[in-house]
A protein has these predicted regions:
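NAD(P)H-binding Rossmann-fold N-terminus in SDR/SDR-like oxidoreductases
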Residues: 11, 15, 68, 153
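Conserved Rossmann-fold cofactor-binding substructure of NAD(P)-dependent oxidoreductases
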Residues: 40-57
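Conserved beta-loop-beta element that borders a ligand/cofactor-binding pocket
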Residues: 134-156
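N-terminal Rossmann NAD(P)H-binding glycine-rich loop of SDR-like oxidoreductase domains
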Residues: 1-23
Length: 204
C-alpha cells in the first residue's frame, strides 16, 4: 500500500511514518521543508500537493498550527489537497483535527464541553479554521475519515484504545501519538469508519 502523509515532519507525522513502515507501506512524506531519511520506503517532498498525492492509495493529513495563535492554514491547505486528489483520482482521505473542534456535545463530558467552548472562544481564528477544515472534508465526495483525539502524549504506546463516532472524551482523556498513528494506519487499510468523525482515546 502507498500512502501520502502531509505534516510528516511533526511529532505525530513521524509516528505515522514509523507505523506505515512497520506495515510494509511505501510513503510519500510531505513537509514544509525538504527532509532526508535513510529509509528507502519513504520519499520526502515539499510544495505541490498534486505531485505528492499522485499514485497514493490513501492520503493522511496530520498537520496543524504549532500554537493556537499561529496564522490559520489548515482549511486552505486541505482544500488544495482535496482538489489534487480529485484531479488524480485518489479517493481515500484521513485527517486529524481534535476533540475540541466543532459541535459534538454528545462526545464530551460536561467539563470537557465547557473547556471546549472556552477554547473555541479564546482561540477563535484557529478553531474556526479547524471547523472549516472539517466542513470541507465532510462535504467532499471522497471516502473520508476524521480522527478527533483529546490530549496527545509522547509516552510509550498503551496498546489498547477506544475509537468510534460515539466515544466520549473527558478532562483526563488522552492518547499516545504512537497509538493514534497506529489507529490511522489500521483505518487506511480496513476502512471501518468511512464517512465518519471518530473520537479516539486510550483505554485506561
Amino acid at each position: 500500500m502507498h500512502v501520502t502523509v502531509f505534516g510528516a515532519a511533526g511529532r505525530l507525522g513521524r509516528q505515522i511514518l514509523r507505523a506505515a513502515r512497520d506495515r510494509g507501506f511505501t510513503v510519500t512524506a510531505h513537509a514544509r521543508r525538504l527532509m532526508s531519511d535513510s529509509e528507502p520506503s519513504i520519499e520526502w517532498t515539499t510544495g505541490d500537493a498534486g505531485s505528492a498525492v499522485k499514485g497514493a492509495d490513501a492520503v493522511l493529513v496530520v498537520f496543524g498550527p504549532r500554537t493556537p495563535s499561529d496564522v490559520p492554514f489548515c482549511a486552505t491547505e486541505t482544500e488544495q489537497i482535496l482538489s489534487a486528489m480529485r484531479q488524480h483520482g485518489v479517493t481515500r482521505f484521513l485527517c486529524v483535527t481534535g476533540a475540541m473542534v466543532g459541535d459534538y456535545p454528545k462526545n464530551r463530558t460536561w467539563c470537557f464541553q465547557l473547556l471546549a467552548t472556552w477554547i473555541q472562544w479564546r482561540f477563535q481564528r484557529s478553531m474556526e479554521d479547524r471547523s472549516r477544515q472539517e466542513m470541507l472534508i465532510r462535504s467532499s465526495e471522497i471516502n473520508w475519515t476524521v480522527f478527533k483525539p483529546p490530549r496527545l502524549t509522547s509516552g510509550n504506546s498503551g496498546g489498547r484504545i477506544m475509537a468510534g463516532p460515539a466515544i466520549r472524551v473527558g478532562m483526563l482523556s488522552s492518547i499516545a501519538r504512537a497509538d493514534l498513528a497506529a489507529a490511522m494506519i489500521k483505518e487506511a487499510e480496513q476502512g471501518r469508519f468511512i464517512g465518519q468523525c471518530v473520537f479516539v482515546k486510550s483505554a485506561h
